[in-house]
Amino acid sequence: MTRYLFDNTGVQTENRFHSLEACYDPFSRRQLARTGLAPGWRCLEVGGGGGSLGDWLGEQVGPGGEVTITDLDPRWTIRHRPPHVRVLRHDIVSEPLPTDGYDLVHARLVLLHIPERLAVLDRLVAALRPGGALVLEEFDCTWQPVLAAPDGGSAALYERVQAALLAQLEKRGADCLWGRKVFAAMADAGLTDLAATTYAESWTGGGTGVGLHHANARQVAEGLREEGVTEDELARYHALLADPEFTVNSLPLISVTGRRPSGER
Ligand SMILES: C[S@@+](CC[C@H](N)C(=O)[O-])C[C@H]1O[C@@H](n2cnc3c(N)ncnc32)[C@H](O)[C@@H]1O
């Protein structure tokens, strides 16, 4: 049974994936391109969500390559694809991968949610060919400074609701600080040539980025009430996210690339 808090059955999922893809795909594509990604590569996109990065990988590797997009619940990836890009309903924690020897394995904002993340990391490393690249991209959920607010109480309200959201995530086994631990975890897993780049931007009320916060808070509204957030606070939080006088730092995405040593068999 999944413990993933924002499961993909929620009607808010489409908006969540839209915000994630619009805000972070250009950055993620740059990180993936830096691995040497080329026609003919075999790639694994784990927890592919809306599938946009898996589709982009498919364009880069061309018909001579192969991309497998997995997800616990891939309902948001259902659309026509070329035959070399396939979608698999798959639990990365409990089900064996159909194959290994990948040139590139990528997962964005997946291991953060999985309590067994270190065991999953070992499986992802084992799925690489010697010399293959792993790219993990994760949030540090704790660094979200408010950059501008319409009044004195708004920053405190934002921080209160976000803290409740993070508390709900942690109760489901998420590690909200995972982003800052990924580099060391990948080194411990035996990867070399490690490099990290972090991306953040400002998100203004009413914009695409804060759509992520709208979607998340709406999907877990009941859990937020359990954390003591009142109906009135929740209503004011959503109004704040719609206010162009409010600007907050985006969640910082820490992208780490490493390679399986070439000498390994
Ligand atoms: C926050 S979303 C990120 C989606 C996408 N990677 C992105 O960054 O746009 C997390 C995704 O991981 C998937 N997921 C969660 N647990 C998983 C598991 N055990 N195995 C495979 N996918 C999982 C969820 O279904 C969801 O689609």
Regions found by a protein language model. Give the residues of each.
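A short SAM/SAH-binding and catalytic strip from SAM-dependent methyltransferases
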Residues: 103-118
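Class I SAM-dependent methyltransferase SAM/SAH-binding core
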Residues: 44-95
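Conserved catalytic/acceptor-binding region of the Class I
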Residues: 135-207
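Class I SAM-dependent methyltransferase Rossmann-like catalytic core
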Residues: 2-25
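A short acidic, Gly/Pro-enriched loop at the edge of an enzyme's catalytic core
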Residues: 95-105
